[in-house]
UniProtKB/Swiss-Prot annotation:
<keyword id="KW-0009">Actin-binding</keyword>
<keyword id="KW-0020">Allergen</keyword>
<keyword id="KW-0963">Cytoplasm</keyword>
<dbReference type="InterPro" id="IPR048278">
    <property type="entry name" value="PFN"/>
</dbReference>
<comment type="subunit">
    <text>Occurs in many kinds of cells as a complex with monomeric actin in a 1:1 ratio.</text>
</comment>
<dbReference type="InterPro" id="IPR036140">
    <property type="entry name" value="PFN_sf"/>
</dbReference>
<dbReference type="GO" id="GO:0005938">
    <property type="term" value="C:cell cortex"/>
</dbReference>
<dbReference type="InterPro" id="IPR027310">
    <property type="entry name" value="Profilin_CS"/>
</dbReference>
<keyword id="KW-1015">Disulfide bond</keyword>
<keyword id="KW-0206">Cytoskeleton</keyword>
<comment type="function">
    <text>Binds to actin and affects the structure of the cytoskeleton. At high concentrations, profilin prevents the polymerization of actin, whereas it enhances it at low concentrations.</text>
</comment>
<comment type="similarity">
    <text>Belongs to the profilin family.</text>
</comment>
<keyword id="KW-0597">Phosphoprotein</keyword>
<dbReference type="InterPro" id="IPR005455">
    <property type="entry name" value="PFN_euk"/>
</dbReference>
<feature type="disulfide bond">
    <location>
        <begin position="13"/>
        <end position="118"/>
    </location>
</feature>
<feature type="modified residue" description="Phosphothreonine">
    <location>
        <position position="114"/>
    </location>
</feature>
<dbReference type="GO" id="GO:0003785">
    <property type="term" value="F:actin monomer binding"/>
</dbReference>
């Protein structure tokens, strides 16, 4: 399966039990900041934004004072899982980032998708990639 198929079929799909509800944007990005696959709606990000995200995975809490920045948007960092999952909130939407052995899985959502639904979609694929050694 291509990386783009993972984004299209596992991240940008309808939320289970909620036909028509899906993430606004999603991507799989290597730890080095290279995009493996992304939805057409995923924001263009700056290298320093990706560096900040990687630093927060290695030093949990690094982004708490300044927020998580992606594609010029600022998210307030909320409770995640140290070294494994970063979650952010912005208005009625937010972001979930799951770190795997080689990649970062991004999901961005707006209402009516809930934070819990975004977490489920992103973390399910992230856990699968981890199990595959990716």
């Amino acid at each position: 399966m291509s990386w783009q198929a993972y984004v299209d079929d596992h991240l940008m799909c309808d939320i289970e039990g909620h036909e028509g509800h899906r993430l606004t944007a999603a991507a799989i990005v290597g730890h080095d900041g290279s995009v493996w696959a992304q939805s057409a709606t995923f924001p263009q990000f700056k290298p320093e934004e990706m560096n900040g995200i990687m630093t927060d995975f290695n030093e949990p809490g690094h982004m708490a004072p300044t927020g998580l920045h992606l594609g010029g948007a600022k998210y307030m960092v909320i409770q995640g899982e140290a070294g494994a999952v970063i979650r952010g909130k912005k208005g009625s939407g937010g972001i979930t980032i799951k770190k795997t052995g080689q990649a970062l899985v991004f999901g961005i959502y707006e209402e009516p998708v809930t934070p819990g639904q975004c977490n489920m979609v992103v973390e399910r694929l992230g856990d699968y990639l981890d199990e595959q050694g990716l």
